[in-house]
Structure formats: structure tokens, C-alpha cells
């Protein structure tokens, strides 16, 4: 596929970001690559918080831990990196959220094909002139040099040899590794080939990286050749869009620029007329909102831990920069809508999760606005004394007592050209940690490596959970906060490894068992287990010591919570039936993409190109309940993996299988490779109910369902809602829908009537104000307080007054719009054309006035609006406005 095929008017209309993505995927699909959807931003890899690279979902394949999905794969992977967050908006190319286009070979083609296709894609499909391209290679990679020089024909002066730090990839100190080759775009080839410096990002931009995994490095550092060589590549979508669309930075591509325009609209300015420093805030907002929308879509909620903290930090930076620009009101919902609209065609799940995304944006924004206003007032008090620095104790008090993020304290300090004493801040944090007894519910990821190494020294756990729910066990190891410990005491949150366990460890989509560990009796020593994971065949039990003391070597009783186990068995068998029913009703090409089997419900993700219709869902559900009623007995047996696959057993990519596998067979219905726990007979499930179907990525659907007791819980909850609504509306249950529709229509009519009445009141009050205008020379001004008038009506009133008073006029209206929030303040300023020509700027005039009311705002020279959170100083603020306006007009 060429540029011309993608866009008939490509010579006058550059490729859009979406067309670039499509062209890349199509190019490699034509060359035998399987197109896979983007993985979630929340990775399976416990060593990283977020998906930071296109290859991350395939890391287990590259390391030889998992089977390859295909020998050739191509993806467009959404990624987030926050290590350079301070550079976002300040450079042309740094972003937190980006898409990485990548083609991968798992033991198939290698260096020659990868280089040839990279060149063909760049020069033919995307139409880049070869004279604008520069290539880098690892200094010792003569094979790559020969291919670039003699097969591709690149000028040797434009093939740059680089050191290991720049052009050699490795997965760690040991393991698979190999040289890289990168393609750069040269914005100024007329400068010639002498003294090419690829670190000069004003001239060069790297847009395509090819990694040739051909070696294995052992513990001594010695390199040996791999039997199967792999290819891992990455092309930044935003960077390629910058090049093809001929814009000065990634932010002004069609992937991001509409967000900058939306921010400019909210501020009331033309983005192209803003200065370089101001544009930093626009770019930060445009970048971060894309990251936030995608994170929330992938199930992340703002919090103070892990990836939740990353989301919270990004959201708070958006709000902070919005306030710097003078946006006077909450704006994340408006911005979120634009971000969803920009990305919805590639990620349809954004539309399906729109309400969840917008609700989380609004919730976190309102929460932070309160924190921000309080913290900024405190910081303003500190800065009013012109300190040389903000002490660590002051920064810590803002953080600990008022919830004001350290990063924002640093940013505000930097804006005022002073520093924060970070060493003293860290000391205060350390004292706080000592004072607060650790009872953390999470393990620091930086300690995960310690736990992994310790677990590798332990013997594999003997799992007895298929046969029994109680067992006598010996404590092999105890971990507290990821570190090895010899004993644990009351209230310690611990992880325990046992020699024998009846507890199922999370795998295959099924969550781990819950239960208790105790010595001779529960009064002697009791540990409540809330989850169990498998780490290299060692089952690690996580829980809290409720009483007594536990030591390594203790002999204890392990007891699984039988009700939760039973629910997991029901939901797991129901999941197998769901996959079988989907294959029968929707299509045999259905394949599993993921699953979750919990105690309360089940979730099944599967590859499917279109939504499953309501009729199909009804048939799927009916079929499953038929199989349940037919009382099929399950047959569980161990088989050689080749025999199992030959017998038709379904396997899933992502699961690790040995030569012997466990097969769960519902004769005539379903046969799967599965290590999970199941019921003995389908009749034990009782009932099955689908509660939701949605898309979570391009080509991947998700069904959520309940089974067994969960069905009764679901219907009881529904009945409770129906009963409450019937009582509330005083109608029968079958009349609720009609009543709701009627009420919706009534609310719409009342809303329109209310808005009309408010506008009439505002205009009535406005008419009386014209005669009260104050005259100064040839100008007239009105500064007046109007309470109980909504923002929109206040804006209309100000504009009407200026029209009536003429070009030599100035109007400032302010008030508290609602009785329900008496501290909320709205301010509006409108200036006539000659007043603006006189040198007055409505936005700049209104800002300091709003600040007196604990707020801020801004706008255009002729019109501005602002908000505040403190109505008490409003009258004094208006008096100040009168003084300043009179002085300016005299």
C-alpha cells in the first residue's frame, strides 16, 4: 500500500495519524505478519507498572518463557513513560503517552529482511526522500553495515557507527541481547555529511529502531549466538506523523493538535498567537489527557499507590497547567470528550467506557481543585516573605497535612526562581515512615526482584488442592515488605511459602484461594490469607497475622475457605462452557484473549471482529443453561500435550504448558488445557447469566457474567432496585419504564423553563443597570453584583450591556450563582472596542480581581470570565475593580 493509495490527495493533504498506523499494519500484514491488537497499558509483567514499549507484551516470548503467537507479528501498542515527565512540552518529542508501531519476528526472518522492509516502508510507502535519511548501527555490526551499504545503497557517510550504550539492546545483565540499527530523519540535509551528530535533536529525529536479538550473554559477560534469532522493532507513530505532516513538533500533529485548540478555546485565545513559554502548558495538557483517558479505560483509578498514583499525578498536572493558563472552571470533562473522539476509531472501548472515564476525570479534578486552592494559598503566604528556599519541613507539611503534591510545590517554586530542600523533605518522610507502623497492602515493586530471587532458592510447592481443602504444612519462608524475615508478629502483613498447600495459586485467570493458617488452634497463631500467587512453582500466600507469632520452620494447618473455593469452581467451569457456546453460536474462529475467574463473577475476553448481538448473547446464555440442566459429568486427566491438542483440547496463548498437561473435559461440549479448579458436574453450577458485553480493544470483546449463587445475588439486587423504584414512583413494576420516560420529558421541559426564567431575570436586572452607568470622560462603566444568576446568563448580560453602552464602555458583573454553594463566585468582564484600543485587556484586568476571591481566570482583550471559591471578599474585590477602572479610564 502506497501513500497515493491511502490518500488520493496526499500531495496536498499529508497522511493522518490514523492513515500512518493503517499503512504500517497493512504493509507487514501483506508480508505474512499476524496483526495483533494493542495490549493493555496495565501489563502482566510485575517488574513494571505500565506498558512502556511495544515489545513488552512479547517479553516472555523473547525470553523463551511462552509460546509465540505466530512467527511474524505486527502491532500498534499504546505506551506510557513518565521518566522524562519534566521534559513534556519543553521539547519537540517528549511525551508520556505514545503509540509504538512494531513488527516482530520470533525465529523467522532476521537482519536482512528487517532492514529491507524498514527502508521500503520508509521510502516507498511513506514516500520519504532517501537524502533525508541517516542510519545508525552498532560499531561492531559489520553485517548491518554491509546490508545498508551494498544491498540498500545508503551513502557510507550517512551510516553512523555508535557505541554499545546507544545501539546495543539487552534484557538485563544476562540473557538475550543484540545490536540495534536506527533510522533518523534529517531536517537539514543541506548541511552535509561531515560531523553528523545524531544527538542534535534540532536537526535529527529517530523514527524507527530495529533490534537484532542474536546473542545470549552469560554471567561472565561472554556472548554466544542464539539458535533462534529474533527481531524487535519500534516506530513512534507521533514522530512519523510529525515528519509526514511537516509540523515543528509531535504536539502539532493531527493526533494531538485538536486538544491544544480545545484548550485555547477554553482560555479564549488563538493558540498560534501564544508565546513559547505559555505553549508548554498547552502541550502538557494535550499530552497528559490522552494518557489519562487511556489509563482509566484500562481500569486504572486515581490513588496514592503504583499506577494509580501515576494517573493522579498526570491529572493534577493537567489541572495545575489549566489554572496557569487562566481556565476558570473545571474542564477535564470537555477535554476528555475531545481525547475520546480523537482515539475512538482505533480504540472503540473508549466510547463504551466513556461514562466511566468522564466520571473519574470529574471526580479527581474537583477533589484536586479543593486541594490546589488550599495549598496555593499556603504557598502564596510562604512566598510573600521572599524566602531563599522552601524548607523540607514546609514542603512536607503541605504534602502530609494538606495533600499538596511535592511535584507541584517544586513547579511553583521554580516559577518563583527558588528551590525546595528535597533532602530535608526526604528526612521528614523517613521520620513519618518510622512513626507509622507499616501495614501496607502492597509490595513495593522495587523489592519484587528480592522476592523473586529468594523464591528461586525454594523447593517447588506440593499442591494438594485438587484433592483436599486442609493440609498440614511447614513454613519454608516468610517475607515482610518483600524482604526475607525469620518471623512475623501480630498485625504484620506477610507472604508465606509452604512446602505443601491446599491453596490454589492465581493462574489461568482464576484468582488464588482465601482461608487461614494456624498452629494447634486459631488462638495460638492465626494468619488470614487473602490471596495466593504462583512464583516459579512456589505458592506464595499473602495475609495478615491476626494473633500470635509465626516462624520459619513452624508446622501449621492450612485451611481453604470452602465457600469461596466452591464459587471459583462454579465460575471456572462456567467460563469453559461460555467459550464453547460462543464458538458454537457466534463462530468457530472465536479464541480466548484473557479471562478472570473470581469468587463473585467471571469475565471472558475473546477475539471477535464485531460486537455480539443481543440475539446471539441470548442464544449463548440459553445454550449454557441447557448444558447445566443436562448434568454433564466432567472428566479431568493428565495427557501428553501433543495428544491433548490432537484430541481437540483448546490451549491459550500466554499460558505455560509442559510436556504433560491437565485436560478438563466436558464430554461432547468442551475440552480445554486447564490447571484450574472445577465442579464435578455441570449441574453443580445451577444457573448462568450474562450481565455485560463490550469491546476492550480493536478486535477484542469482553463478556461479564455470573453463575451459581452469583445469579441469585444478581437477581436479588435487581429486584431490590425494582422494588425501591416502584415505591418511589408509586407504580407497579411493569409501569416503571413508562414513568421514567415521562419524568425525563418533564425534567427537560422544566430545565428549559428555568433557563428561560433565569435569563429573563438577568435581562430585567440588566435593563435597570444601564441608567446607573458611571461616566468618565467619553467612557461609561458598570461594576455590579448580581447574585442568583447562572454563569451563562451573566455572560449574556455583560455582552448586552456593552452593546447598549457602546464602544467606549466597560462592564464587570459578579455574583454567587446558586444558594446551594454560597461560596462559589462567578465574575465576567466585557470591554467595548475603544476601551480595548485604550490599552485595557479584560482577561488581565479580571485575573487579580478573581484572585481576591480565591480563584483565577482570564480571557480575550474584549471578554473574560473567572471563578472563585470565597464570596466573602467579593464586595471589596469589586471596590478595587472600580478604583482600577476609574484610574485606567481617566
Swiss-Prot record:
Coiled coil: none
GO molecular function, one term: ATP binding
A GO CC annotation given for this chain: cytosol
Binding-site positions, Zn(2+): 572, 576, 674, 678
Function per UniProt: Catalyzes the attachment of alanine to tRNA(Ala) in a two-step reaction: alanine is first activated by ATP to form Ala-AMP and then transferred to the acceptor end of tRNA(Ala). Also edits incorrectly charged Ser-tRNA(Ala) and Gly-tRNA(Ala) via its editing domain.
Domain description: Consists of three domains; the N-terminal catalytic domain, the editing domain and the C-terminal C-Ala domain. The editing domain removes incorrectly charged amino acids, while the C-Ala domain, along with tRNA(Ala), serves as a bridge to cooperatively bring together the editing and aminoacylation centers thus stimulating deacylation of misacylated tRNAs.
Name of the molecule in the record: Alanine--tRNA ligase
Amino acid at each position: 500500500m502506497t501513500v497515493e493509495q491511502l490518500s488520493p490527495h496526499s500531495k496536498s493533504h499529508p497522511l493522518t495519524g490514523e492513515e500512518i498506523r493503517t499503512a504500517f499494519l497493512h504493509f507487514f500484514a501483506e508480508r505474512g505478519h499476524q496483526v495483533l491488537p494493542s495490549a493493555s497499558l496495565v501489563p502482566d509483567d510485575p517488574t513494571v507498572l505500565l506498558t512502556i514499549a511495544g515489545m513488552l507484551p512479547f517479553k516472555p516470548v523473547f525470553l523463551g518463557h511462552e509460546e509465540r503467537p505466530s512467527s511474524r507479528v505486527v502491532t500498534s501498542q499504546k505506551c506510557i513513560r513518565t521518566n522524562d515527565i519534566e521534559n513534556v512540552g519543553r521539547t519537540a518529542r517528549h511525551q508520556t503517552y505514545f503509540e509504538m508501531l512494531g513488527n516482530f519476528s520470533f525465529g523467522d526472518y532476521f537482519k536482512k529482511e528487517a532492514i529491507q522492509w524498514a527502508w521500503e516502508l520508509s521510502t516507498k510507502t511513506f514516500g520519504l526522500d532517501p537524502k533525508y535519511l541517516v542510519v545508525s548501527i552498532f560499531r561492531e555490526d559489520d553485517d548491518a553495515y554491509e546490508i545498508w551499504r551494498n544491498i540498500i545503497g545508503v551513502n557510507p557517510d550517512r551510516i553512523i557507527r555508535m557505541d554499545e550504550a546507544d545501539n546495543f539492546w539487552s534484557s538485563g545483565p544476562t540473557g538475550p541481547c543484540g545490536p540495534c540499527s536506527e533510522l533518523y530523519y534529517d531536517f537539514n540535509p543541506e548541511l552535509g555529511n561531515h560531523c553528523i551528530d545524531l544527538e542534535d535533536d534540532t536537526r535529527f529525529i529517530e523514527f524507527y529502531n530495529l533490534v537484532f536479538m542474536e546473542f545470549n550473554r552469560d554471567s561472565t559477560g561472554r556472548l554466544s549466538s542464539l539458535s533462534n534469532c529474533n527481531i524487535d522493532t519500534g516506530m513512534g507513530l507521533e514522530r512519523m506523523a510529525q515528519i509526514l505532516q511537516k509540523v515543528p513538533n509531535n504536539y502539532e500533529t493531527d493526533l494531538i493538535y485538536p486538544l491544544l485548540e480545545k484548550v485555547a478555546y477554553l482560555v479564549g485565545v488563538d493558540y498560534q498567537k501564544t508565546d513559547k513559554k505559555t505553549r508548554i502548558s498547552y502541550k502538557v495538557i494535550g499530552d497528559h489527557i490522552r494518557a489519562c483517558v487511556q489509563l482509566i479505560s484500562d481500569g486504572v483509578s486515581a490513588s496514592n499507590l503504583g499506577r494509580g498514583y501515576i494517573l493522579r499525578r498526570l491529572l493534577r498536572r493537567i489541572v495545575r497547567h489549566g489554572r496557569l493558563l487562566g481556565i476558570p472552571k473545571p474542564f477535564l470533562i470537555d477535554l476528555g470528550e475531545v481525547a475520546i473522539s480523537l482515539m475512538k476509531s482505533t480504540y472503540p472501548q473508549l466510547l463504551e467506557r466513556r461514562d466511566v472515564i468522564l466520571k473519574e476525570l470529574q471526580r479527581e479534578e474537583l477533589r484536586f481543585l479543593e486541594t490546589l486552592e488550599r495549598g496555593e494559598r499556603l504557598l502564596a503566604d510562604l512566598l510573600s516573605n521572599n524566602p531563599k528556599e522552601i524548607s523540607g519541613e514546609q514542603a512536607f507539611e503541605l504534602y502530609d497535612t494538606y495533600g499538596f503534591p511535592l511535584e507541584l510545590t517544586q513547579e511553583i517554586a521554580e516559577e518563583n526562581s527558588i528551590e525546595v530542600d528535597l533532602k530535608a523533605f526526604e528526612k521528614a518522610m523517613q521520620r513519618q515512615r518510622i512513626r507509622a507502623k507499616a501495614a501496607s497492602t502492597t509490595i513495593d515493586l522495587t523489592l519484587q526482584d528480592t522476592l523473586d530471587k529468594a523464591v528461586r532458592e525454594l523447593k517447588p510447592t506440593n499442591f494438594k488442592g485438587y484433592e483436599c481443602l486442609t493440609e498440614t504444612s511447614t513454613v519454608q519462608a516468610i517475607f515482610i515488605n518483600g524482604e526475607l524475615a525469620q518471623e512475623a508478629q501480630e498485625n504484620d502483613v506477610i507472604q508465606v511459602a509452604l512446602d505443601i498447600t491446599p491453596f490454589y495459586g492465581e493462574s489461568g485467570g482464576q484468582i488464588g484461594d482465601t482461608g487461614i493458617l494456624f498452629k494447634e488452634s486459631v488462638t495460638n497463631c492465626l494468619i488470614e490469607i487473602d490471596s495466593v500467587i504462583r512464583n516459579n512453582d512456589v505458592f506464595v500466600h499473602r495475609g495478615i497475622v491476626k494473633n500470635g507469632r509465626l516462624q520459619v520452620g513452624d508446622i501449621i494447618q492450612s485451611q481453604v475457605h470452602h465457600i469461596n473455593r466452591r464459587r471459583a469452581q462454579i465460575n471456572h467451569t462456567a467460563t469453559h462452557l461460555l467459550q464453547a457456546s460462543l464458538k458454537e453460536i457466534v463462530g468457530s474462529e472465536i479464541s480466548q484473549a484473557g479471562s478472570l475467574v473470581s469468587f463473585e463473577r467471571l469475565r471472558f475476553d475473546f477475539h471477535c471482529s464485531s460486537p455480539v448481538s443481543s440475539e446471539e448473547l441470548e442464544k449463548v446464555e440459553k445454550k449454557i443453561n441447557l448444558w447445566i440442566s443436562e448434568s454433564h459429568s466432567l472428566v479431568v486427566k493428565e495427557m501428553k500435550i501433543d495428544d491433548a491438542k490432537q484430541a481437540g483440547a483448546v490451549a491459550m496463548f500466554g499460558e505455560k504448558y509442559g510436556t504433560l498437561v491437565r485436560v478438563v473435559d466436558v464430554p461432547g461440549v468442551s475440552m480445554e488445557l486447564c490447571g484450574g479448579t472445577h465442579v464435578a458436574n455441570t449441574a453443580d453450577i445451577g444457573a448462568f447469566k450474562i450481565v455485560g458485553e463490550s469491546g476492550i480493544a480493536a478486535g477484542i470483546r469482553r463478556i461479564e457474567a455470573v453463575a451459581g449463587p452469583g445469579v441469585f445475588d444478581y437477581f436479588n439486587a435487581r429486584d431490590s432496585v425494582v422494588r425501591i423504584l416502584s415505591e418511589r414512583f408509586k407504580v407497579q413494576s411493569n409501569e416503571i419504564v413508562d414513568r421514567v420516560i415521562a419524568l425525563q420529558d418533564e425534567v427537560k421541559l422544566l430545565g428549559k423553563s428555568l433557563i428561560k426564567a433565569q435569563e429573563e431575570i438577568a435581562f430585567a436586572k440588566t435593563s435597570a443597570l444601564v441608567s446607573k452607568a458611571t461616566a468618565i470622560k467619553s467612557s461609561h462603566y458598570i461594576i455590579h453584583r448580581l447574585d442568583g444568576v447562572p454563569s451563562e446568563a451573566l455572560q449574556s448580560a455583560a455582552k448586552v450591556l456593552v452593546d447598549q453602552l457602546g464602544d467606549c464602555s466597560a462592564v464587570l458583573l459578579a455574583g454567587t450563582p446558586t444558594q446551594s454553594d454560597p461560596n462559589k463566585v462567578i465574575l465576567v468582564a466585557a470591554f467595548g472596542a475603544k476601551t480595548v484600543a485604550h490599552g485595557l485587556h479584560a482577561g488581565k484586568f479580571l485575573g487579580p480581581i478573581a484572585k481576591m476571591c480565591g480563584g483565577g481566570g482570564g480571557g480575550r482583550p474584549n471578554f473574560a470570565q473567572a471563578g472563585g471559591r470565597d464570596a466573602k471578599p467579593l464586595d471589596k474585590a469589586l471596590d478595587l475593580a472600580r478604583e482600577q477602572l476609574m484610574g485606567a479610564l481617566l
